[in-house]
Every structure is written in C-alpha cells, then in structure tokens.
C-alpha cells in the first residue's frame, strides 16, 4: 500500500516512517530496515526516501511533509547511533525562517589541487572520517 496506493487506487497518504537501520555491531536481528528494498520500490515519485543526518535536516523534511499541497509517504532511514551522536547537532538558526532542507551536506574544507578523490558518504560514515582525520 505504501508504494503503490497512489498509482493503483488513486489514494495519497502522508505517512511518515522513521526506520532505524544498520548493524552497528549488533548483528542482523537488530537491523530493522533495508534501504535497498525501498530504493527498488521507488518509481514515478511514489515515495520520498530520506536519510537525515542532522536535526535541522530532520526538522525541515518533516516540515516540508506537512506544508506541501500534496501527500507522499516519507521514509526516513537513520542509523541508530546518529540519534545520540555528539557530532550530530544543529543550531536553532539552521531551523529558523529562511533556512531550508539540504539534499546534500558538504565539508567546508578548502579546495586543494592535489586532491584526486572525492568521497560521497551517507549515514554516520562522515563522523568516522572526521574522527579519523
């Protein structure tokens, strides 16, 4: 119903699901969501799949869900460790009027010509990289 209701039955819904995922050392019985299954079900803008890694982005994606003039299911995949990670913080300014949802978050590092690789990360991988550096 979640992915096909609009196409099959012309029924829209604004269901919001927060599905924590990732093993994070706990084993497969602790992983409650499979991103790849939802990605396979995405077709013709039938659902919104998000992976909000900051409180501000989570706020904006929920606000956007309520304020839009149409309804689509929103599935937010978030690793459990990000719910309490010390680097996963936002200011009120990032949630204030004039701020918006960011599809991508980027590092504000300076451009260096010797850089030959760029890494795109999701989930809490960026926190591992920042801790490594």
Where are these regions (language model features)?
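Histidine-anchored nucleotide/phosphate-binding helix
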Residues: 1-7
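Short internal beta-strands
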Residues: 16-19
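Gly/His-enriched, cation/cofactor- and phosphate-binding structural elements
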Residues: 133
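Active-site phosphate/pyrophosphate-binding segments
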Residues: 11, 24-130
């Amino acid at each position: 119903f979640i992915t096909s209701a609009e196409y099959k039955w012309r029924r829209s819904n604004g269901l919001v699901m927060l599905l924590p995922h990732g093993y994070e050392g706990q084993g497969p019985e602790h992983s409650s969501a499979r991103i790849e299954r939802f990605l396979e079900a995405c077709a013709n803008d039938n659902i919104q799949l998000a992976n909000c890694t900051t409180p501000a982005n989570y706020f904006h994606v929920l606000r956007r869900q309520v304020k839009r003039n149409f309804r689509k299911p929103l599935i937010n995949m978030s690793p459990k460790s990000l719910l309490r990670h010390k680097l996963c913080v936002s200011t009120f300014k990032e949630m204030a009027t004039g701020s918006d949802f960011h599809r991508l978050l980027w590092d504000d590092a300076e451009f260096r010509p010797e850089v030959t690789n760029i890494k795109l990360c999701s989930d809490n991988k960026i926190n591992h990289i920042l801790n490594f550096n």
